[in-house]
């Protein structure tokens, strides 16, 4: 169990306590529904729907994030396109085997969703284990950056594999870590468009990752 001084909070008024010895995957988003919800899948006898949520950064650019929620949640919130929403949930990953777009897709599984007039917000807190050696590199502008792949356990025993990046001194420190390192990070979920070279030309794709503002090695 982590010491009390490692217990953090995203927003107590939302009941979203960042108690790292109890919750290792929490997301808080405020943004705008960018398109009408579409049917996603059925699991455990429940229908799930998905929609894109646009969240504005301080820079003025936007992250477009995939939200997945139960049909009952969708009916209760009665949200329409362009609605302002608060989403509390968990970051999930799945492998895209359709052969189109990114291979690893991140979604936010909504545990709570409601209409809001709060400003845009994008925060995530994760505790997990490195499952791949860090990839340290330098950007064309000379900034140190390090790519990490974090395995975050669910209560069910399965794991989500979440790509993360960190910068500067944090990137240089993370570059020395090994597979099996346990760490905690806080940051935001971001979407990033890029071009993929294919046989018939360039294809625009979207990558999803966690940009870490704070990161700490736990074990």
Show where each model-derived region lies.
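OB-fold and OB-like single-stranded nucleic-acid-recognition modules
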Residues: 2-219
């Amino acid at each position: 169990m982590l010491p009390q001084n490692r217990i953090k909070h995203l927003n107590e008024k939302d009941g979203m306590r960042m108690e790292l010895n109890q919750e290792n995957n929490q997301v808080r988003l405020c943004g705008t529904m960018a398109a009408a919800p579409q049917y996603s899948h059925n699991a455990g006898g429940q229908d799930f729907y998905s929609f894109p949520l646009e969240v504005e950064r301080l820079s003025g650019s936007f992250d477009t994030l995939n939200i997945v929620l139960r049909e009952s949640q969708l009916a209760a919130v009665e949200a329409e396109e362009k609605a302002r929403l608060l989403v509390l949930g968990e970051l999930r990953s799945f492998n895209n085997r359709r052969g189109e777009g990114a291979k690893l897709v991140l979604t936010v599984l909504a545990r709570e969703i409601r209409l809001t007039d709060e400003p845009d917000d994008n925060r995530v807190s994760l505790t997990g284990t490195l499952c791949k050696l860090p990839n340290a590199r330098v950007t064309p502008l000379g900034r140190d950056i390090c790519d990490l792949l974090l395995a975050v356990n669910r209560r069910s025993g399965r794991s989500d594999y979440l790509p993360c990046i960190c910068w500067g001194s944090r990137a240089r420190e993370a570059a020395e870590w090994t597979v099996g390192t346990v760490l905690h990070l806080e940051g935001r979920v971001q979407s990033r468009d890029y071009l993929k070279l294919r046989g018939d030309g360039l294809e625009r794709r979207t990558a999803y990752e966690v940009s870490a503002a704070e990161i700490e090695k736990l074990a």
